[in-house]
Amino acid sequence: MNINKLKFPLVVKPSDRSAGRGVVKVNNTEELKIAYKNAKSLSNNGIVLVEEVLDGKQFSVETISENGMHIIVAITEEFFRQGKYEDDFLEVGHLIPARLNDKEKSAIQKETLKILDAFEIKFGACHIELKLDINGVKIIEIASRMGGWRNTLIRDAYGYNINEMLLNVSLNKKIKFKEQKNKFNAIVNFIFTKDDFEHYKWTRKKYPEFISDDFVNAKDDTKFFYASDLLCSNGFYYLKIPPRTDMKQFLPKGYK
């Protein structure tokens, strides 16, 4: 392949990693070479993916399949770092359920079912990442596992026990699932910066009843450094926001 003929920008990432490790947008051949070496060093199978940059907002879908029948458990709205390091695609927060109108939700659901059938998924969990814009849905990737942090978000939002559902599938037991309206808006925020930590402290002081759980390593004297992936966070915390409460103030900085 002649890399000089590639159209930039592009996204480079390892084929088999998680938590955003090694994922970066590149704008020229020199950046591509550096990103390729880094992604290859992180990949367990040595395979590096080079993809086009997709427009639109990013969402992910959690599914469970049983004998080839698929259940769409939840759709997550994903938030990414903005500003100087936005090309690293670092996730800074997740929201369940995603804020979608009926048409958008239907489009995502239809594409999700198509991709599960295309890959002949019969049993277990899948985590599908996608972009949505005015032109429709574009699939980024599919993984045969549940997305990180989703079990708690799904529990907080809907009351579903997705771990129990997956266990029942593995034991060949019938899944009992009835789609219902969310009871809460469930958020997980990650702590990468001093501002993130201050936002956590503000939330804990002013709205302690909204924090369903937290795992925070940061302290007032913590020195924050550049983070390249979710494993570099200084912790995270879950929020259960009542449906009629304005949740914009609880979202990651820069999002409404």
Question: Whereabouts are the PLM-identified features?
Answer:
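ATP-dependent carboxylate/phosphate-activation module, predominantly the ATP-grasp catalytic core
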Residues: 52-58, 63-121, 125, 132, ...
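Active-site proximal loops enriched in glycine and acidic residues that flank catalytic Cys/His/Asp
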Residues: 141-144, 241
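Conserved protein kinase catalytic/activation segment
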Residues: 135-138
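Short, flexible turn/loop "capping" segments at secondary-structure junctions
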Residues: 14-17, 88-89, 227-233
